[in-house]
């Protein structure tokens, strides 16, 4: 299941301005990050699929209510790459900010002394010749959550010797040290190529590694320790090389009032779309596929294949037209396949049902869930094939038998 994110995640971070950046990169309609963003003539940006679905109900901009049509939309490849880059770095950025706050909260002040010393503070307001110092009472020291809070009344003491002031100031500075968690740097051993702390490597490990007998396993090569080059997509290169080179044409809107049901089925069949359900189901199916098609091949910088579009349509069809399809008497509809084995495998079925409506559909899990049904279909197909082959063989042998019988009777 996808993790829900919100711009408010950065509200209490060290950089609260990132909340506005996170919010600006989200679609006003779906509240999620922009996907295949398009620009309107009035200067607003939405997801391509979101605004197309909105315009099918009301031909106005959702923000300023200016007149808007689908033909006015323009792709924004730059905003798409900015959004994808931010999405890839968002979680790491949030983790770094949270870890920074945690390290600052857990900083500890350690008092280095065998005995409980008096806490001294030099009073700069007094005359230099008076040699006054201020002593803080240590009876009111409160330790809460790894933090030391020092309170108390100030008492003034006169020193006897003039030279004692710098000595006491030096002692005061040595009484407090800040202890921070530091991770010791590591380096690979030039002999066994394993990582060790640098201090341990220089003082101890090198001598031990040189004197110990060689093992049967060959040493690890240095190239294995070097980080592999990143396989992530370069959004800068993709934007600079971006151009709409798709050979697919825009899918037109149809005038269903002038089309018969048979013509509508022919149109769906030409696009390899299911023709089950009522006429209203088929109209809704084509309208949604038209939005998917144009959003993908017209507005996307990285369009997916037609088979993926049909899978998304099947997911949408299962959640919107499922009841109507089953009432139509269909036996192989997606909605009925999703309901198979739901009683016996409830949790697994529910998880697949949720994932089926998203891009992260588990095909292997689906095959395992319906493995028995697939095997049954295979057995039925094999039986039908054998039966057909036997019938063909029998029909081919019958003319031969009749011809031999006529020859015998003639003799």
Swiss-Prot record:
Pathway: Protein modification; protein ubiquitination. One of its GO terms (biological process) is error-free postreplication DNA repair. The keyword Protein biosynthesis does not apply. Residues 256-290 form the SAP domain. Its main location: nucleus. Belongs to the RAD18 family. This is Postreplication repair E3 ubiquitin-protein ligase RAD18.
């Amino acid at each position: 299941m996808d993790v829900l994110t919100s711009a408010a995640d950065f509200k209490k971070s060290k950089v609260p301005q990132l909340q506005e950046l996170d919010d600006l990169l989200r679609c006003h309609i779906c509240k999620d990050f922009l996907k295949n963003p398009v620009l309107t003539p009035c200067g607003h940006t939405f997801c391509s699929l979101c605004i197309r679905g909105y315009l099918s109900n009301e031909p106005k901009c959702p923000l300023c209510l200016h007149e808007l049509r689908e033909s006015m939309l323009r792709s924004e490849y730059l905003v798409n790459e900015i959004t994808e880059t931010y999405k890839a770095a968002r979680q790491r950025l949030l983790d770094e900010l949270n870890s920074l706050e945690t390290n600052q909260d857990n900083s500890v002040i350690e008092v280095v002394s065998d005995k409980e010393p008096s806490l001294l503070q030099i009073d700069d307001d007094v005359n230099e010749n008076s040699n006054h110092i201020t002593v803080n009472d240590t009876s009111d020291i409160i330790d809460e959550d790894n933090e030391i809070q020092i309170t108390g009344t100030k008492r003034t003491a006169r020193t006897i010797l003039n030279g004692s002031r710098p000595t006491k100031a030096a002692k005061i500075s040595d009484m407090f040290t800040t202890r921070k968690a530091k991770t010791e740097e590591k380096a690979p051993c030039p002999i066994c190529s394993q990582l060790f702390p640098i201090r341990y490597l220089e003082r101890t490990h090198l001598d031990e590694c040189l004197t110990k007998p060689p093992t049967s396993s060959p040493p690890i090569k240095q190239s294995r320790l070097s980080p592999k080059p990143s396989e992530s997509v370069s959004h800068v290169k993709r934007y600079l090389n971006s151009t709409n080179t798709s050979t697919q044409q825009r899918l037109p809107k149809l005038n269903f009032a002038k089309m018969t049901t048979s013509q509508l089925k022919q149109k769906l069949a030409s696009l390899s779309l299911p023709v089950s359900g009522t006429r209203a189901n088929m109209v809704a199916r084509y309208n949604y596929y038209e939005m998917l098609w144009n959003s993908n091949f017209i507005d996307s910088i990285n369009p997916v294949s037609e088979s993926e579009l049909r899978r998304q349509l099947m997911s949408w069809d299962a959640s919107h037209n499922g009841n109507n399809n089953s009432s139509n008497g269909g036996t192989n509809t997606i909605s009925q396949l999703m309901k198979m084995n739901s009683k016996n495998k409830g949790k697994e079925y529910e998880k697949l049902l949720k994932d089926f409506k998203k891009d992260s559909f588990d095909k292997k899990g689906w095959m395992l869930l319906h493995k028995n049904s697939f095997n049954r279909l295979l057995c039925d197909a094999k039986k039908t094939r054998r039966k057909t082959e036997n019938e063909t063989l029998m029909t081919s042998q019958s003319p031969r038998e009749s011809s031999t019988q006529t020859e015998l009777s003639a003799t």
